[in-house]
Amino acid sequence: MRRERDATQIPENPMEGIPQTAAAAAAAAAAEASEPPRKRARVDGGGGGAGEEEEDRLSDLPDCLLEDILAHLGSRQAVQTSVLSRRWRNLWRGVRVVVIDVGSFRLPGADGDPPRFRLDRIEDFADGVLSPSLHPGAARELDALRMRLDEDAVTTNFQRWIRRALWRRPATVDLYYLPRRSFSWPPAVPLTPVTAVSRLKTLRIFGLRPTVVFGADEFPALEDLHIERCSYAHGTIASPTLKRLALVSPINGCFVREQRLTAPGLTSLRLVLPYSREEGVRVITDAPLTSLVDASITIVDTDPGDPRNRRVNQFKVDFLVAISNLLGRLTSVRNLDLTGLNATALLDNKSQEFPMFPYLTTLLLNECDIGYKYHVLRSILQNAPNLEQLRLHNCKFVGKSRRKAGQTQSKEKTSKCSSSTLSSACSSLKSVEIKHPRGEPSHDLLHEFLKEIPHNQWRKRSIDEETISIELNRK
């Protein structure tokens, strides 16, 4: 009997894109599912030759279980199984995960050639999976929407696919857009109305331009927010439900200079912030983040390594001071990773001391400036009384000890920093890991550090060959 093509625009070759082994297995499974339960021989493990028989109950599996299996295949392969048998014909419609990955429609080409895609197939497939003929209330709610788009593969208004998916009230949305041109401006992405995102708990956006404010009224259930290489013009993230936030490489630092954060329930924060003499996004929070447990801050100076760029620049100074102020709001953290921070960013602008971190147990300083005769490191150890693990990766101590113009360092502070050894500054310290490339000037840090540590209290654990990596553990 000739089968009619489904209205969901199944490709002419429905098995295209499925590996032969997977296709064969799926076909066999579907064939068994479409037949009545039957007996099949099972070879006895003892090799006695007398096979036992068991029933094949694949066809008895409930739809919900098969739909969960299809959810792990991705939408394209899930749709392709619909032509295998009647048992599988409409199962994909009930799958609560929609995955649209244009990479599976890429045409073969030589290495190094620009990617080419089957644009018509992409549009037909996406329009079929997210059919406009389905009334918003008729389709099942989604557990997740995942879209991986490419600038060269999307010539149509892909926002309509997002809009249709949002009407199914997904709990997780993952949108990835890969630009191919250097000066491409991120396309806008709609995330409205509120009723469509009322269940949304996890939102990850890459390379797009969200047009809505991330606030409590707009996203009443949002807990996990990841924004990477996006242009976000509103400059405010305010959510009492937010628990995890990642703001990675925002690309609008030339006209949006501040990102205000209000999230009293935040437990995890990750920031990757490029900055230069002309642009950079400063993250500001008015109140301490008292629920924070894990924090990671990376700052990247994007100015060329030209001697002229080493001169004092007020915009850079303001950016680094903002990082220092932010650190002072994160004092409840237990695990802290810092990359690229210099003394201006690490020390408080007024007291010239590291903020007090009473609960900090694990600290990573990566490519940080720990000060003249590591006075910054001393301040860190003195103000982190419960620190247990310290990792110093590719750190350096350059420049002179910081002090305000026209002021001298107080005798109390001088005595405090110079009289204590690194070991006594933090008595709770249990392990120290120092890494840097062999032959780099930062080996002085290792020698100076070892000189101040009582050898009868610490022992070396490992030394790497390519990089000098020494782990010290308290006995």
Curated annotation (Swiss-Prot):
Probable component of a SCF (SKP1-CULLIN-F-box protein) E3 ubiquitin-protein ligase complex and may function through the ubiquitin-mediated protein degradation or signaling pathway. Required for male meiotic prophase I progression. Required for telomere bouquet formation, homologous chromosome pairing and for the formation of the synaptonemal complex (SC), which stabilizes initial chromosomal axial associations and promotes crossover formation. Belongs to the F-box protein family. FBX subfamily. Part of a SCF (SKP1-CUL1-F-box protein) E3 ubiquitin-protein ligase complex. Interacts (via F-box domain) directly with SKP1. Disruption phenotype: Plants are female fertile, but male sterile as they are not able to produce tetrads and microspores. No differences compared to the wild-type plant during the vegetative stage. Plants develop normal panicles and floral organs, except for smaller and pale-yellow anthers that fail to produce viable pollen grains. No effect on the differentiation or early mitotic division of germ cells. No meiocytes are detected in 4.5 mm and 5.0 mm long flowers, but in 3.0 mm flowers meiosis appears to initiate normally. Disulfide bonds: none annotated. GO terms for biological process: DNA repair; meiotic cell cycle; protein ubiquitination. Keywords: Chromosome, DNA damage, DNA repair, Meiosis, Nucleus, Ubl conjugation pathway. It comes from Oryza sativa subsp. japonica (Rice). It comes from the Eukaryota. It is found in: Nucleus; Chromosome. Pfam families: F-box. The lineage of its organism: Eukaryota, Viridiplantae, Streptophyta, Embryophyta, Tracheophyta. GO terms for cellular component: chromosome; nucleus. Gene3D superfamilies: Ribonuclease Inhibitor (3.80.10.10). Residues 1-58 are annotated as: Disordered. Residues 22-33 have a biased composition (Low complexity). Highly expressed in the stem, leaf and in the anther during meiosis. Weakly expressed in roots and lemma/palea. Pathway: Protein modification; protein ubiquitination. This is MEIOTIC F-BOX protein MOF. Residues 55-91 form the F-box domain.
